[in-house]
Curated annotation (Swiss-Prot):
Keywords: Ribonucleoprotein, Ribosomal protein, RNA-binding, rRNA-binding
Function: Binds directly to 23S ribosomal RNA and is necessary for the in vitro assembly process of the 50S ribosomal subunit. It is not involved in the protein synthesizing functions of that subunit.
Top-rank taxon, per record: Bacteria
A Pfam family annotated for this UniProt entry: Ribosomal_L20
Presence of keyword Ribosomal protein: yes
Record GO cellular component, one term: ribosome
Protein name (Swiss-Prot/TrEMBL): Large ribosomal subunit protein bL20
One of the protein's GO biological processes: ribosomal large subunit assembly
Record family assignment: Belongs to the bacterial ribosomal protein bL20 family.
Tagged with keyword RNA-binding: yes
HAMAP family reported for this sequence: Ribosomal_bL20
Length: 119
C-alpha cells in the first residue's frame, strides 16, 4: 500500500479555517490553531444568539407596547387581555410597530380593548 502524504488536504483544511477567520483580530486571523478555536467559538455564539434574538425582540416589542399602552391608560397585561376578549388577533410585532409608527391606530385598538374589558 502506498504512503499517503497529507500536504494537500492539510493545506486545504487550514485554508478553509483561515478563510472563515478572515477579519478577526491578531493571531485569530493568522495562526491556524488560534483561528480554529476562534471559528468554533464564533459558531457557538452564532448558534446561541440566533435563539436569543427571538427572545430579545419579543422583549423589545413588549416594552414598546407597554409604553404606548400606558399612555392610553392601560397596562400591557390589561391591553393583551382586552384584545383577546375583543377577538382582535394582532401579534406583538405588529402592535409594537403600530405603537412606534401609528399611534392613532394603536390608540383606537386600545379603546376597543378597554371596551371589551368593561363589557
Amino acid at each position: 500500500m502506498p504512503r499517503v502524504k497529507r500536504g494537500v488536504t492539510a493545506k486545504a483544511r487550514h485554508k478553509k479555517i483561515l478563510d472563515q477567520a478572515k477579519g478577526y483580530y491578531g493571531a485569530r486571523s493568522r495562526t491556524y490553531r488560534v483561528a480554529k478555536q476562534a471559528v468554533i467559538k464564533a459558531g457557538q455564539y452564532a448558534y446561541r444568539d440566533r435563539r436569543q434574538k427571538k427572545r430579545q425582540f419579543r422583549a423589545l416589542w413588549i416594552t414598546r407596547i407597554n409604553a404606548q399602552a400606558r399612555e392610553c391608560g392601560l397596562s400591557y397585561s390589561r391591553l393583551i387581555d382586552g384584545l383577546k376578549k375583543a377577538s382582535i388577533e394582532l401579534d406583538r410585532k405588529i402592535l409594537a410597530d403600530m405603537a412606534v409608527h401609528d399611534k392613532v391606530a394603536f390608540a383606537a385598538i386600545a379603546e376597543q380593548a378597554k371596551a371589551a374589558l368593561a363589557g
